[in-house]
């Protein structure tokens, strides 16, 4: 359902426009997602979520050419208890004109179902799928048969004022690149590799 809209935006060559949803749109609390429609195929962007003075994270916007066409992989889930107070939130959008019933298969064999109407957006935490209970035994998952669905996940730790996030994608590859690591001056780098298939695989990690 269309909640709000703003006037036409002109971007000059190499131009950039920042929009704060809460400032530029009416009824911002009712807005679940935004579509930027352009007469050019040379537009890119990103979304930034933040609480001033606490945490922030930036996640790329999704071009219509990269809408998922199959299973979506939830690469990492952090849902701990009081001693590990991480929360994982998932946001998904059905970009199609048909309703969808999505099954989420977790790595501990649990399954949950999420219903999406045509063009519907839903946001939920992993805990909310289990009655609000933390799920420290779940580390990853697969959203099955999710063609036409896009999404992202956010990780938060309120005690540490930490936030992170990634897109939910359907692509896999033989080789994956981690283009930057930092392990000095207090920086730490964590890398994650996830095998969503039912077959074992051998991974060779080569640092350069």
Regions found by a protein language model. Give the residues of each.
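Gly/Pro-rich, tryptophan- and cysteine-flecked surface segments typical
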Residues: 1-208
């Amino acid at each position: 359902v269309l909640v709000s809209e703003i006037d036409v935006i002109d971007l000059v060559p190499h131009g950039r426009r920042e929009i704060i949803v809460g400032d530029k749109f009416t009824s911002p609390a009712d807005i679940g997602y935004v579509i930027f429609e352009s007469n050019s195929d040379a537009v890119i962007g990103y979304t930034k979520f933040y609480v001033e003075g606490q945490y922030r994270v930036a996640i790329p916007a999704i071009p219509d050419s990269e809408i998922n066409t199959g299973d979506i992989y939830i690469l990492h889930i952090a849902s701990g208890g009081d001693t590990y107070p991480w929360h994982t939130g998932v946001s998904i959008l059905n970009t199609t004109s048909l309703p969808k019933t999505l099954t989420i298969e977790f790595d501990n064999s649990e399954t949950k179902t999420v219903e999406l109407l045509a063009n519907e957006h839903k946001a939920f935490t992993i805990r909310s799928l289990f009655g609000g209970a933390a799920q420290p035994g779940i580390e990853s998952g697969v959203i099955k048969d999710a063609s036409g669905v896009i999404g992202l996940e956010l990780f938060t730790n309120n005690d540490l004022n930490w936030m992170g996030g990634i897109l939910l994608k359907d692509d896999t590859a033989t080789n994956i690149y981690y283009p930057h690591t930092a392990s000095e001056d207090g920086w730490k780098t964590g890398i994650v590799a996830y095998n969503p298939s039912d077959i074992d695989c051998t991974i060779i990690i080569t640092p350069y």
